[in-house]
């Protein structure tokens, strides 16, 4: 497996535990179906079997933790914090102009949260991140806001 950071390994373990509903260390097709359903997908039995077959290297019909880690490692690849930060910024910067406006922030927050934020709360979030005072958040300001102090 590729070298994974401790954070990535913890994330993989959390994901595995979410799939492994009964906690027996294996993901069955039934457990996979439950998780897929919670994600709004309804795969057929054949699709579920195919998903498991792609990952199930020992051929026992279930996905063990080691197989899950191997699959996730292939998908994750090496982490590039700069690239991840740029991708996160792009999620907010809907029109791609390099600035996050209050309208863009409101749109993203509406998608990610059930709580409806007031215009005042959105404006406050922008103000907190907006170092140069132009009423928008540029990439450098976004990085400062997202980086733990």
Curated annotation (Swiss-Prot):
Keyword field: Acetylation, Calcium, Metal-binding, Repeat
Stored InterPro entries: CALM/Myosin/TropC-like, EF-hand-dom_pair, EF_Hand_1_Ca_BS, EF_hand_dom
Modified residues (N-acetylalanine): 1
Molecular functions (GO terms): calcium ion binding
Repeat among keywords: yes
Protein function: Not known. This protein has four functional calcium-binding sites.
Protein name, per record: Squidulin
